[in-house]
Amino acid sequence: MRKLWITLPILFFGYVGQVEANNDVHCLAENIYHEARGESTAGKMAVALVTLNRVKDKRFPDTICGVVKQTKFYPSGRIDLHSCQFSWYCDGKSDKPRDKKCWDDALLIAE
């Protein structure tokens, strides 16, 4: 756990203004949870960093939720399952976290 507190300020330096709304914190936590639930703290933080870096990149949406939920739709309105930036968002499974400890860890990193 000590490593988490040492690494977080370094990881999120320069991103303080990016995680402003509870909605963005929730979206980031969801992404960390679903992409890296079984990973180490470093792996979870890497997912957070990828997400935040995309927010800063002009090729991606400019919000955390926009990046996490970025996808393309067919003209019929159906999601193109191969276009999601993060696979968990388009896999058709429930996105509700089922592992409380992993969710709490993801939320801590996202905050």
Where in the sequence are the language-model features?
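Bacterial extracytoplasmic/cell-wall-associated proteins, especially those involved in peptidoglycan
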Residues: Y15, V19-E111
